[in-house]
């Protein structure tokens, strides 16, 4: 067992086979389903849950350790935290499968998107729902009858709905690639990313950790949310920047925000700075494959890379101020938030 406050990916990955075995037993032994059904489920699990950085899942374990002031977790405590972490990764996998279909993304994590794998296609929609349902079966197996069970079930249900509502807002405002750019304003962007990204990527792992150490008081949850939502927005701004400016071979996927007409941070910033002619260029080209190069050229003309770097430093300074003022009297720890911020600051993929 690692003694540092940062768990290793190898250690975290070592728990996954047990969860796969649990689901295998459910399908083949309890449900008596044919092997072909389990084979499909297992392929779905392995392709979509593995292969990423697992930052969300690892954050659950790291947060539990930090909330316990860096004390080494017992094997049972580590396993519980790792299970909760893997359930966050299953929720992430669910949403990525569906997001890739809606965005038409050809790759994910350097591999073909699941729906692009031969023999999968639109059946990936059902595969995604299997991934989400697995969350609740595993929660039942490991936490039923314990005090955290119902609050954590509720937390996963609410978080899933938040993501889905954020995704719906994102798609509606993109209007199938023909967006009304007058609606692309900072307040709208902030609301979309709060629900689409911030809650599940940042608030969920820490809230789960607070439940795991019996410190999920209303005060602590509210304080965590006040820091983690703007941190999650910063993370999504990074994603939007990387979607346009990062090397796809490094990022592991091909950016599609411009082609899809998404309400990206970059286009919101461009619209705030554009002249009348530049705004017209955006209106004519944003949301089409043929106009992507023109939009990227305009982003360079407006020096949005510098705008992004300025935003990053300002947001990080604001977050550090919030962390400094955090009340630790009910068991919350500043180190939880410092650790998360350190992981994402100036990331390049």
From Swiss-Prot:
Species: Penicillium aethiopicum
Domain of life: Eukaryota
Cofactor: Mg(2+)
EC number in record: 2.5.1.10, 2.5.1.1
Family: Belongs to the FPP/GGPP synthase family.
The name this protein goes by in its record: Farnesyl pyrophosphate synthase vrtD
The record's free-text note on cofactor binding: Binds 2 Mg(2+) ions per subunit.
PANTHER family linked to this entry: FARNESYL PYROPHOSPHATE SYNTHASE, FARNESYL-PYROPHOSPHATE SYNTHETASE
A GO cellular component entry from the record: cytoplasm
Binding site for Mg(2+) 2: 99, 103
Catalytic activity: isopentenyl diphosphate + dimethylallyl diphosphate = (2E)-geranyl diphosphate + diphosphate; isopentenyl diphosphate + (2E)-geranyl diphosphate = (2E,6E)-farnesyl diphosphate + diphosphate
Pfam families: polyprenyl_synt
Keyword Metal-binding: yes
Chain residues that bind dimethylallyl diphosphate: 108, 196-197, 236, 253, 262
InterPro entries named in the record: FPS1-like, Isoprenoid_synthase_dom_sf, Polyprenyl_synt, Polyprenyl_synt_CS
């Amino acid at each position: 067992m690692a003694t540092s406050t940062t768990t290793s990916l190898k250690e975290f990955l070592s728990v996954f086979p047990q969860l796969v075995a649990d689901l295998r037993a459910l399908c083949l032994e309890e449900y008596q389903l044919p092997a072909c059904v389990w084979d499909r489920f297992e392929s779905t699990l392995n392709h979509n849950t593995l292969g990423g950085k697992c930052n969300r899942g690892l954050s659950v374990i790291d947060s539990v350790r930090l909330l316990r002031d860096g004390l080494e977790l017992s094997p049972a405590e580590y396993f519980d935290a790792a299970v909760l972490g893997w359930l966050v990764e299953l929720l992430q996998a669910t949403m990525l499968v569906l997001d890739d279909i809606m965005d038409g993304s050809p790759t994910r994590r350097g591999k073909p998107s699941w729906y692009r794998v031969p023999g999968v296609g639109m059946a990936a929609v059902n595969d995604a729902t299997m991934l989400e349902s697995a969350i609740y079966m595993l929660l039942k197996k490991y936490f039923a009858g314990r005090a955290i069970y119902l609050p954590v079930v509720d937390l996963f249900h609410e978080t899933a709905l938040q993501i889905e509502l954020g995704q719906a807002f994102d798609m509606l405002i993109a209007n199938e690639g023909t967006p009304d750019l007058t609606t692309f304003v900072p307040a709208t962007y902030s609301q979309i990313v709060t629900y689409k990204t911030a809650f599940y990527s940042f608030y969920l792992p820490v809230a789960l950790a607070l439940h795991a150490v019996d410190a999920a008081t209303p005060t602590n949850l509210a304080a965590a949310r006040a820091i983690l939502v703007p941190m999650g927005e910063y993370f999504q701004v990074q994603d939007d920047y990387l979607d346009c400016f990062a090397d796809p071979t490094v990022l592991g996927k091909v950016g599609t925000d411009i082609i899809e007409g998404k309400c990206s941070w970059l286009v919101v910033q461009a619209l705030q700075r554009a002249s009348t002619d530049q705004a017209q260029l955006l209106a004519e080209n944003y949301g089409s494959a043929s106009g992507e190069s023109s939009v990227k050229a305009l982003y360079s003309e407006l020096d949005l890379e510098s705008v992004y770097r300025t935003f990053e430093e300002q947001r990080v300074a604001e977050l550090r101020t919030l962390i400094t003022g955090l009340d630790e009297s009910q068991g919350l720890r500043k180190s939880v938030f410092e650790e998360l911020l350190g992981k994402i600051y100036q990331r390049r993929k």
